[in-house]
Amino acid sequence: PYINGKRRPHIPLYFLTSNFSFSGAEALPFAFQSLKRAVVVGETTGGGAHAWIGKIATDRFYVHVPNAYSSDPKTKKDWEGVGVKPDIEVPAKDALLRAHIEALEKLAKSDTAKTTLYNWHLETAKSKLEPSIVLDHATLHSYTGEYGSRRVTLENGKLYLHSNGSKLEMLPMSKTLFRIEEVNILRVNMVLEKGIVTAMERRLAFGDSYLVPKAK
């Protein structure tokens, strides 16, 4: 049937899968993967391509009888018993982030007017996938203090930025660079001179940055 709207055959598509994806949840990624129209990200699926109906065989037995199946019209293959193997294999819990990374990498290359913004969010996504950076107490404590109208505190091993009445957790991306989950266009970089923290650099996703000296 006719579907109203603009065709967009070149827009990248991603399917997220797990080993619990089964039957109908496998059909679409299988079909689009076979057509090379989408990227499957996650885990190999459960492998249920053959439909069945239940039949009472005797007064003691009830059987499942296969009555339909889906297959690739070219190869005649299906995913029964083997599942749909992902193009990018990662644990299911990481599939969405991994798909974000793939999409952002393509956007950063294709849309040069927004490369800076896409690379910003790409760095954020990659930092979420990497093992958490652990900073020692002395390093964390050295970052606390007053920075203009803002303040950094240390509570239970975590740094918090207090700004305009908000208390925002600072998540480390490196030894000095922190992202703010609640404000994804803001990062905080601690500036050191000869090992001493002298300022906070507020970086914004669009490329701007502001240096705020630390109070003595």
Task: Give the location of each predicted region.
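C-terminal "post-core" interaction segments
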Residues: 1-141, 194, 200, 207, ...
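Loop/turn-rich, solvent-exposed surfaces of beta-rich toroidal or solenoidal domains
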Residues: 4, 148-151, 155
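Short acidic-hydrophobic surface loop/beta-edge motif
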Residues: 53-58, 147, 178-180
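Short polybasic amphipathic segments
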Residues: 70-71, 158-162, 179, 198-202
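Short, surface-exposed beta-strand/loop "edge" segments at domain boundaries and coil↔beta transitions
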Residues: 71-74, 166-170, 184-190, 204-212
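Central antiparallel beta-sheet cores of small beta-barrel/beta-sandwich binding domains
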Residues: 153-188
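Calycin-type beta-barrel ligand-binding domains and close structural analogs
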Residues: 156-160, 203-216
